[in-house]
């Protein structure tokens, strides 16, 4: 039985003060979620990980933290990077790797993403490995080939039992355009087939909102969501976390 993971990626948003105030609103709104039914994850900016880890320590039983990236070395001359050892000290559970934004803005390769994912697993972190195609690649009929390459190269040598994959069609991220639920489900099913492990957790990401979450989570091969902009409002994110299957 695959346990859905609802994750909010704040990206480069919220100061430490704002993050704490957010949690003061969010945590009470999650109290009725069946804890055995789903897991809730927040990926704040690196600066907010420490205050949030301290704040939620004794305040909830169902909320975990994720980093927005992780380096493959434990330490060294890697300006602006964060090591897995640093994250371990903060009781961080997951690490997002391969998101389309660092792929686009910092030219991250599948090889680098693979190294990040391996480093995460080597330090007891669960990597959330993001894959997805551009609009042009989809229009040219290249979506499946591109995603399969990302899976094969990005997950080489990865322990699939300690892994989350997030399918995020790049053309749907932050655009208001959502991949139709049936099509997202089809791609997630293909990803599961390519990985070759039935119980791998596969999320969908791309303009997930409170008004489409119930349909998305009703799909048979979608095991959660990776939410961007819609996770910045605690009331809105709570509605997403409290989804009900149709």
From Swiss-Prot:
EC number(s) stated in the UniProt entry for this protein: 5.3.1.1
Disulfide bond residue pairs: none
Keywords: Cytoplasm, Gluconeogenesis, Glycolysis, Isomerase
InterPro entries per record: Aldolase_TIM, TIM_sf, TrioseP_Isoase_bac/euk, Triosephosphate_isomerase, Triosephosphate_isomerase_AS
Secretion signal span: none
Gene3D superfamilies named in the record: Aldolase class I
Quaternary structure and partners: Homodimer.
Protein name: Triosephosphate isomerase
